[in-house]
A protein has these predicted regions:
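N-terminal nicking endonuclease/strand-transfer module with a His-rich metal-binding environment
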Residues: 1-156
């Protein structure tokens, strides 16, 4: 039987976090944060099954590179306590194979976030073969129609 678990967090400078570091961790990669000059290296981390960046059509193509996407977010958010990203950790059903879990996540992320103008970066981890889960990192602000960030943003209206 599938076990449900979902955890939601905010990545903010006020809590000492970085969107670049969060993305590097979940993608088991090395990324340089232009904002603070720190290199984040998680290339020795194990268990990465799949990773993908999903963008709305108005997003710049270079944001398909997660390092450029999250550095753009870090540059746009100016204050020392800025909210940089929303992060979800979601358990995936062990009953589904890898391709089914990927498809499930892509559909969920597209319908709930990307179609509303948000950029999404996700990775599937399963270190021991018994705990498949996904890390989803989302931009806090959806993009405007012209591919720029809004000056301020207060709420997200969910589709009915």
């Amino acid at each position: 039987m599938a076990i449900y678990h979902m955890q939601a967090k905010v990545v903010s400078r006020g809590s000492g976090r970085s969107a670049v570091a969060a993305s590097a961790y979940m993608s088991c990669s090395r990324m340089y944060n232009d904002y603070d000059g720190i290199q984040h290296d998680y290339t020795r981390k194990q268990g990465l099954i799949y990773q993908e960046v999903m963008l709305p059509p108005m997003a710049p193509l270079e944001w398909n590179d997660r390092e450029q996407l999250w550095n753009a977010v870090e540059e746009n958010e100016k204050t020392k306590d800025s909210r940089l990203a929303r992060e979800f950790v979601v358990a995936l059903p062990v009953e589904l194979d890898k391709d089914s879990n990927i498809s499930l996540l892509q559909d969920f992320i597209k319908k709930n976030f990307v179609d509303m103008g948000m950029c999404a970066d996700f990775a599937i981890h399963d270190t021991d073969g018994h705990n498949p889960h996904a890390h989803i990192l989302l931009t806090v602000r959806p993009l405007n129609e012209n591919g720029t960030w809004p000056v301020s943003y207060t709420h997200l209206t969910l589709p009915t």
